[in-house]
Amino acid sequence: MDGDTLSGFHYELIEAFARDHSLQVAITPEMSFNERLEGLANGRFDVIAYGILATSELKDSLLLTSPIVLNRQVLVQRKTDSPDDSLFIKSQLDLAGKTLNVVEGSPSILRIRNLGNEIGDTIYIKEVEKYGSEQLIALVAHGDIDYAVCEESIARAAADSLPQIDINTAISFTQFYSWGVSKQSPVLLDSLNTWLERFKKGKEYRKIYKRYY
């Protein structure tokens, strides 16, 4: 969301898909990832047009399209002028004992848990139900929370208007992200994959991609 206007990489992509198939698309902004999965399962949604990282947990819940974009999860925190600021995270090891805010049901939760195992210490996770990534970033910027984890592309877009945030600490490696459809919709999956294979080779996709990445 940009103010009261829907926008973004995935929005422009699903609009292009609908246009090319002479379909009317109804967009429902849903912050909670769990609610997205539930909406897909009960038929309220046809597609989760949002970057979904393929994990073994999710593969039991939905069908994933062919990869759409490369992205990674990053830590969002406030910049500091003090080298001794104990709140400022300089490396993943500094995350020990810290609490990271994420969108409820976010696939990044599994990665954060694994990261805790890698550094040999506990990283606490707070799932936020009513806010999306953009809102969590704003809460960090304004000092309401100290840390959030979200996709790098979203964080970079936000950093343009929130210069006080630091997004340089990676939480995950760069990985492919896909869209999701119901396990009962293999025909829709095939249609999306066929279209994506063709569309990603064209100028329009490159133009949209450059706008957000």
Predicted features along the sequence, with ranges:
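Extracytoplasmic small-molecule ligand-binding "clamshell" domains
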Residues: 1-60, 125-129
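Hydrophobic residues within well-ordered alpha-helices
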Residues: 17, 40-41, 75, 95, ...
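A ligand-binding cleft/hinge motif common to bilobed small-molecule-binding domains
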Residues: 34, 38-41, 50-61, 111-118, ...
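Flexible hinge/capping segments at coil-to-helix
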Residues: 79-100
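Ligand-binding clefts/hinges and TM-proximal coupling segments of bilobed small-molecule sensing domains
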Residues: 105-124, 128, 163, 167-168, ...
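Periplasmic-binding protein-like
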Residues: 69-77, 82, 129, 133-134, ...
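Short beta-strand->loop
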Residues: 2-6, 97-105
